């Protein structure tokens, strides 16, 4: 996939894997959006280096075939080192929002319907 410019922001597609299926994530300027996946190759991971905001899939705490669990998502957060991370695509198996949110590292939070992310 080719990168494009939209409203003065570089839009860069990122190939990630949903189990064996290739799916797209996006980097739009200082924001990376990576959802519905469980694997990313090092060369694709390098494309999100320096993002300020990361939006990333974290389905639940237990391992899953085609999605990141919480530990896997947090490992990627440590590698990418954004200023702010929003976890998305959570299931009911993640736990109660306030309880899980209280356990997350600084700069990482559970998202919610209606959240507006400023970049």
Q: What are the functions of these language-model segments?
A:
Residues 41-53, 58-119:
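Binuclear metal-ion centers of metallo-dependent hydrolases, dominated by the metallo-beta-lactamase
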Residues 1-46, 113-119:
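Core dinuclear metal-dependent hydrolase active-site scaffold
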């Amino acid at each position: 996939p080719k990168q494009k410019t939209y409203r003065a922001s570089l839009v860069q597609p990122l190939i990630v894997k949903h189990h064996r299926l290739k799916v797209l994530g996006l980097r739009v300027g200082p924001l990376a959006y990576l959802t519905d996946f469980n694997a990313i190759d090092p060369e694709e991971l390098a494309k999100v280096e320096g993002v300020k905001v990361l939006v990333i899939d974290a389905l639940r705490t237990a391992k899953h075939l085609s999605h990141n669990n919480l530990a896997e998502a947090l490992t990627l957060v440590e590698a990418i080192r954004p200023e702010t991370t929003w976890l998305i695509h959570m299931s009911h198996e993640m736990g109660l929002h306030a309880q899980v949110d209280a356990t997350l590292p600084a700069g990482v939070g559970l998202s919610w319907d209606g959240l507006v992310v400023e970049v």
